[in-house]
């Protein structure tokens, strides 16, 4: 359904009574920490798997003889699959009502696809060497197979990631969404630490009896972790059963409508969700080049000052980059554990402050048609929605609050270390500023250890990126009563994460082509300039984030 002007002007209020009467509105029990760990542990496997691509992808492609501008084009696989695959997976899983649930079948299939793609990535040169005798043809086919493996791996990662995020929204109460997403951030942090630690260790020596290369051992370990963690989530987490609905459109029709009415879907988002998406757009424009090129950047600085005889030692340079990412992951994991405890718990002040919110410019009356988010004709009427959206909502648990009061130990610790006035939006804004400063600092960096220190500091910002936007977004979905369409809603959110990465890739390609025109030395400064452009985008994300600040900030 498209958004029409009359519908926007004559919307009806989605009241708490309507939400309560919805057949999708059912009681969700309070979830224990063990349940949340089982729910989010699949993200650990996903991140460890993705660390293969992040830590070794670019150096691996360089080792195959690929030039930088071509590697940037290949890395467009990630955002493209994010734009296409996550919404499709969300729409399909929203419609599934199988015995084992809506999300878990997709997670299991994607984990098997990820295992196959890792095998293809690690053994592509060996496969081509076995089949082809012509060296030139062998190299070309190896590059093709490596590219296919990267695309398949991105599809698998996106499906598991989207399904897990939707499962969090489906299975956890609104007042526990922050805690659940904090656990998700921790799992991603642990996956990062393990992944980059494995990338730094000489795996080919540790597992010398296998006679595998470093990348091949890494791919085997990543495959095991992906299948194991997804299996744990599938076994120990039960999904909610939603009432069956009669869909007025086919699956293909709904997918086609999603992409053709993307603009209307974005326009129909409530104020807070829309602002979160805008922040994510500029944030990921900056993060994408960092994640894919920082290993190479650190390696370049290492080679510039490498000991005599090691000037072309790209294996050691890659390990130096992996060590930087290991520090990055450790700081990120520590921050994901500590930062939530520093947030101010404003529940006691919520009622007093909410009365002032109605007079604030960010307390906005919106009339949105959410028909394009419905799952079928029997879905509770969500079209013609008029809602009063305030970042502080009366009679709702604080969306900045992380831990339920039942977690007495953690609440006690948090009460001792809380920073007055520190809320999720303020912390998120600060993280963008910090990341932007770090990227611009590449102007002054000269050695690999300086770059490693800078990368480690960025772990603070990455911790916030993995946790805060998802906490705000999923909590808002729950409060709006849109859980039955959470897969599609998260698909819209992911478009704002993936689209800027495509744009960032195009800009990086232009920068690389210009640098190749002047000289073909791989150790030029073009990657540093791509990182600096990302830093400028981080400041734009901070500017957009101001709309989410507390009303008295």
UniProtKB/Swiss-Prot annotation:
GO cellular component, one term: Golgi apparatus
Extracellular side: 55-72, 133-140, 208-216, 302-322, 446-452, 516-521
Superkingdom: Eukaryota
Record flagged with keyword Membrane: yes
CDD domains: MFS_SLC45_SUC (cd17313)
Region annotated Disordered, chain positions: 1-26, 368-399
Topology within the bilayer: Multi-pass membrane protein
Cytoplasmic face residues: 1-33, 94-111, 162-186, 238-280, 344-424, 474-494, 543-553
GO biological process, one term: sucrose import across plasma membrane
Segments of skewed composition (Polar residues): 1-21, 374-392
InterPro entries to which the protein is assigned, alphabetical: MFS_trans_sf
Locations listed in the record: Membrane
MF annotations from Gene Ontology: maltose:proton symporter activity; sucrose:proton symporter activity
Keyword terms, alphabetized: Membrane, Sugar transport, Symport, Transmembrane, Transmembrane helix, Transport
TM spans (from-to): 34-54, 73-93, 112-132, 141-161, 187-207, 217-237, 281-301, 323-343, 425-445, 453-473, 495-515, 522-542
A Pfam match: MFS_2
Function: Responsible for the transport of maltose and sucrose into the cell, with the concomitant uptake of protons (symport system).
Recorded family membership: Belongs to the glycoside-pentoside-hexuronide (GPH) cation symporter transporter (TC 2.A.2.4) family.
Name of the protein in question: General alpha-glucoside permease
Organism of this sequence: Schizosaccharomyces pombe (strain 972 / ATCC 24843)
